[in-house]
């Protein structure tokens, strides 16, 4: 079935505290992940929280990559959404590897497959 895009959502557990808390490392990892997948980078924005944690986004011509880290839990949530021919798993796999994730739970959603008709339930 044709889709407009693919959206990979990953829960990363058992990640290294220092990596999850290092804004420069996270930003470089995400830029590298986008480039490895063949994406064209448009904008990059990351923020470091106190006392810990990083959130950020890499906007690509084909959509986006995002992260929210919780170093105190060894946890990061990532989204990689691509349109067109790009494979989002390339970037998601690279990010999980770079963060040293011990456990990874991932789902992939096809996006833009056409509107879904939802019918109202009939009362009995």
Curated annotation (Swiss-Prot):
UniProt PTM comment: Is synthesized initially as an inactive proenzyme. Formation of the active enzyme involves a self-maturation process in which the active site pyruvoyl group is generated from an internal serine residue via an autocatalytic post-translational modification. Two non-identical subunits are generated from the proenzyme in this reaction, and the pyruvate is formed at the N-terminus of the alpha chain, which is derived from the carboxyl end of the proenzyme.
Keyword tags: Autocatalytic cleavage, Decarboxylase, Lyase, Polyamine biosynthesis, Pyruvate, S-adenosyl-L-methionine, Schiff base, Spermidine biosynthesis, Zymogen
Its cellular-component GO annotations read: cytosol
Reaction catalyzed:
S-adenosyl-L-methionine + H(+) = S-adenosyl 3-(methylsulfanyl)propylamine + CO2
Cofactor field: pyruvate
Site, Cleavage (non-hydrolytic): residue positions: 62-63
Pyruvic acid (Ser) modification sites are: 63
State its Enzyme Commission number(s): 4.1.1.50
Q: In which pathway does it act?
A: Amine and polyamine biosynthesis; S-adenosylmethioninamine biosynthesis; S-adenosylmethioninamine from S-adenosyl-L-methionine: step 1/1
Cofactor, free-text remark = Binds 1 pyruvoyl group covalently per subunit.
Q: Which GO terms describe its molecular function?
A: adenosylmethionine decarboxylase activity
Alphabetized Pfam families for the sequence: AdoMet_dc (PF02675)
Kindly state a single biological-process term from the GO annotations of this entry. Answer: spermidine biosynthetic process
Report the active site residues.
63, 68, 83
Endpoints of the signal sequence: none
Top-level division of the source organism's lineage = Bacteria
Q: Does the keyword Cytoplasm apply?
A: no
InterPro entries, sorted: AdoMetDC_C, AdoMetDC_fam_prok, AdoMetDC_N, S-AdoMet_deCO2ase_core, S-AdoMet_deCOase_pro-enz
- The first-level EC class reads lyase
> PANTHER family per the record?
S-ADENOSYLMETHIONINE DECARBOXYLASE PROENZYME
Q: What does the sequence similarity comment in the record state about its family?
A: Belongs to the prokaryotic AdoMetDC family. Type 1 subfamily.
Q: How does it assemble?
A: Heterotetramer of two alpha and two beta chains arranged as a dimer of alpha/beta heterodimers.
The record's function comment reads:
Catalyzes the decarboxylation of S-adenosylmethionine to S-adenosylmethioninamine (dcAdoMet), the propylamine donor required for the synthesis of the polyamines spermine and spermidine from the diamine putrescine.
Identification of the protein by name:
S-adenosylmethionine decarboxylase proenzyme
């Amino acid at each position: 079935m044709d889709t407009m895009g693919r959206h990979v959502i990953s829960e990363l557990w058992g990640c290294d505290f220092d990596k999850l808390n290092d804004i420069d490392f996270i930003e470089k990892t995400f830029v590298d992940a986008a480039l490895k997948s063949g994406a064209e980078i448009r904008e990059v924005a990351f923020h470091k929280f106190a006392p810990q944690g990083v959130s950020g986004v890499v906007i690509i011509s084909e959509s986006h990559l995002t992260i929210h880290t919780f170093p105190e839990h060894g946890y990061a949530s990532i989204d990689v959404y691509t349109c067109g021919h790009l494979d989002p798993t390339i970037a998601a796999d690279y990010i999980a590897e770079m963060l040293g994730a011990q456990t990874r739970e991932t789902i992939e959603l096809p996006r833009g497959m056409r509107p879904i008709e939802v019918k109202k339930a009939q009362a009995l």
